[in-house]
Amino acid sequence: MPASSDKLQPKDQQTIELEQKLAVQSIRVFLQSKTSYDVLPVSYRLIVLDTSLLVKKSLNILLQNNVVSAPLWDAQTSKFAGLLTSSDFINVIQYYFHNPDKFELVDKLQLNGLKDIERAIGIQPYDTRSIHPFRPLYEACVKMIESRSRRIPLIDQDEETQREIVVSVLTQYRILKFVALNCKEIRYLKRPLRELDIISTNNIMSCQMSTPVIDVIQLLTLAGGVSSVPIVDEQGKLVNVYEAVDVLGLIKGGIYNDLSLSVGEALMRRSDDFEGVFTCTENDKLSSILDTVRKSRVHRFFVVDSNGFLTGVLTLSDILKYILFAES
């Protein structure tokens, strides 16, 4: 009898793998059959900022409206001019930190001067791609992955004037939530994460509660594309996270006066609507991960072992890449 049971086990594993492969392929077909416009809610609010606006005023607008990014508009050319994100404010902080004598320049900086800041501190600008809202959703996902961005602007064109129209901005989170809400196939994604090769485990940056905020900001700048730094205790156990968007709340009271604060002190100023730290283990399944995305506003999962030690990071970009390109 034991020998017979052993023979059945590989078949069970093969079934799980086959079901996952077919499920991913089905989700991919779903993404190809839908447009970016299909993801948008029936009604929504969109904040678009003119490139002549002062950076400090744009920060206040983002905070007052509880958003972390906004499309930019060049009134002179009547064209979309990029996206304003927390990374732009981090770049300005870096510039001011290394050039304290330029305080007045930073205080009068307009949004159209952010590219000059990038060049001054040696930051490679992001490739901000856009897409027409009626193009396939799959195409929008691929463009996001190729440009290393977590969001993509949807740009239409007025038929009479031929001028561009900013329709909305689509995020990886919104796309994956759309998948989780509409694709029943996710229940077949039962392979453990450790088998999928989608967890980042090498060179995971971290900090502690006592780490100066400016050190964490420098980590966010140097890493490129990283939007958060996990906070661990002396033993390496995960206790919290410092996100790029936390920088916005830190500098709202003045122009970068509190960079000497520790991470722990800075977190005291965090907004009350912080979603929390989401964790998983390498034994969790994508089905449960996407179920969490369906229920909660989550942007990444920190992978921990059974004792709570940080072992890796699983981003929404990692999940999206797997759905787009794996199991083909």
From Swiss-Prot:
It holds the Pfam family CBS. One of its GO terms (molecular function) is protein kinase binding. AMP binds at R150, S227, S228, T315, L316, S317, D318. ADP 1 binds at I47, R151, T171, Q172, Y173, R174, R297, V298, H299. ADP 2 binds at R150, S227, S228, T315, L316, S317, D318. Residues 42-103, 123-186, 199-259, 268-328 form the CBS domain. Signal peptide: none annotated. SMART domains: CBS. It is found in: Nucleus; Cytoplasm. One of its GO terms (cellular component) is nucleotide-activated protein kinase complex. Adenine nucleotides-binding subunit gamma of AMP-activated protein kinase (AMPK), an energy sensor protein kinase that plays a key role in regulating cellular energy metabolism. In response to reduction of intracellular ATP levels, AMPK activates energy-producing pathways and inhibits energy-consuming processes: inhibits protein, carbohydrate and lipid biosynthesis, as well as cell growth and proliferation. AMPK acts via direct phosphorylation of metabolic enzymes, and by longer-term effects via phosphorylation of transcription regulators. The 4 CBS domains mediate binding to nucleotides. Of the 4 potential nucleotide-binding sites, 2 are occupied, designated as sites 2 (or A), and 3 (or B) based on the CBS modules that provide the acidic residue for coordination with the 2'- and 3'-hydroxyl groups of the ribose of AMP. Site 3 can bind either AMP, ADP or ATP (AMP, ADP or ATP 2). Site 2 binds specifically ADP (ADP 1) and is likely to be responsible for protection of a conserved threonine in the activation loop of the alpha catalytic subunit through conformational changes induced by binding of ADP. Belongs to the 5'-AMP-activated protein kinase gamma subunit family. PANTHER family: AMP-ACTIVATED PROTEIN KINASE, GAMMA REGULATORY SUBUNIT, LD22662P. This is 5'-AMP-activated protein kinase subunit gamma. It comes from Kluyveromyces lactis (strain ATCC 8585 / CBS 2359 / DSM 70799 / NBRC 1267 / NRRL Y-1140 / WM37). The gene is SNF4.
